[in-house]
UniProtKB/Swiss-Prot annotation:
Changing residue 28 to S: Does not affect heterooligomerization with C1QL2. This is Complement C1q-like protein 3. The gene is C1ql3. Its main location: secreted. Gene3D superfamilies: 2.60.120.40.
Length: 255
């Protein structure tokens, strides 16, 4: 733009009677100081005092109403664990637990013998039997005492004549067998435990037709053991309800 002015206007004309003058285009003074060192009139240098005095004075008004609550901020980080709370009340009573294992044997008692308590009697199993012989037997066979009077626990079987143990312990057995004689022979009756003779008895026919063979035992039995009376020759009397021949037993105490 400056180059264009230099080419088109080579000379500037100055006018007399004015404080402004023109110089050659391109000089610094024309561009930077067109008024020739004189100050240009200014209309904004002096403020208007009347205008400033007419402006109103602002006074602080009363406090306004509280604004509406703002929205909830973001969730903060977890706090530190609090102190333990107070101990709560006891809970309800629980169900009974399972029965514990037996404890060790107690210390021996005093020298004086004490009486057997009623609790001891109640703990002994109820096992006892008593039966008579109705049918006659002879030779070598198991006597089947089929006239049963007592059979607590049902451990005696009249169809086989055998007592079968189900509770281990000490047992007592006794038997009385009436011999049927008259021909000069003798009779043997054995008490057996599992095919082993544990007691024997003999009745002989000398001057009378009848004689007894009797015996008793105390045995320790295990579950499954069998006890019975077996003839080992001769004849056993039977055939009525008088129970001349009998077999009985009971438990003394369990293991």
């Amino acid at each position: 733009m400056v180059l264009l002015l230099v080419i088109l206007i080579p000379v500037l004309v100055s006018s007399a009677g004015t404080s402004a003058h023109y110089e050659m285009l391109g000089t610094c003074r024309m561009v930077c100081d067109p008024y020739g060192g004189t100050k240009a009139p200014s209309t904004a240098a002096t403020p208007d005092r009347g205008l400033m005095q007419s402006l109103p004075t602002f006074i602080q008004g009363p406090k306004g109403e509280a604004g509406r609550p703002g929205k909830a901020g973001p969730r903060g980080p977890p706090g530190e664990p609090g102190p333990p709370g107070p101990v709560g009340p006891p809970g309800e009573k629980g169900e009974p637990g399972r029965q514990g294992l037996p404890g060790p044997p107690g210390a021996p008692g005093l020298n004086a013998a004490g009486a057997i308590s009623a609790a001891t009697y109640s703990t002994v199993p109820k096992i006892a039997f008593y039966a008579g012989l109705k049918r006659q037997h002879e030779g070598y066979e198991v006597l089947k005492f089929d006239d049963v009077v007592t059979n607590l626990g049902n451990h005696y079987d009249p169809t086989t004549g055998k007592f079968t143990c189900s509770i281990p312990g000490i047992y007592f057995f006794t038997y009385h067998v009436l011999m049927r004689g008259g021909d000069g022979t003798s009779m043997w009756a054995d008490l057996c435990k599992n095919n082993q003779v544990r007691a024997s008895a003999i009745a002989q026919d000398a001057d009378q037709n009848y004689d007894y063979a009797s015996n008793s035992v105390v045995l320790h039995l295990e579950p499954g053991d069998e006890v019975y009376i077996k003839l080992d020759g001769g004849k056993a009397h039977g055939g009525n309800n008088n129970k001349y021949s009998t077999f009985s037993g009971f438990i003394i105490y369990a293991d």
